[in-house]
């Protein structure tokens, strides 16, 4: 790979990352809206907001569908942060 090709690859990859970041942002906001609806339903049903079993199901679901290259433990930490927010 020449330096010119490397610069082109770098710029293309950065543009793609920018696109993916916007998709992540949209998805995270949509997820938050759904979580808010769940919270409202749980209030009406007088259910606890925090359900450790459900959190474990989320982790199992995402790690079970992960085809890499992101390691399962990294993915779990990312989802822990998403859930905590």
Q: Model-flagged regions — what are they?
A:
Residues 1-85:
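Domain-level signature for soluble enzymes in the chorismate/prephenate branch of the shikimate pathway
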């Amino acid at each position: 790979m020449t330096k010119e090709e490397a610069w082109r690859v770098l710029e293309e990859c950065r543009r793609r990352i920018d696109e993916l970041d916007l998709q992540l942002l949209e998805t995270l906001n949509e997820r938050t809206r759904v979580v808010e609806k769940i919270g409202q339903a749980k209030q009406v049903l007088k259910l606890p907001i925090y359900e450790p079993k459900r959190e474990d199901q989320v982790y199992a679901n995402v790690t079970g569908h992960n085809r890499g290259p992101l390691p399962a433990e990294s993915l779990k930490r990312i989802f822990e942060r998403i859930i905590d927010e």
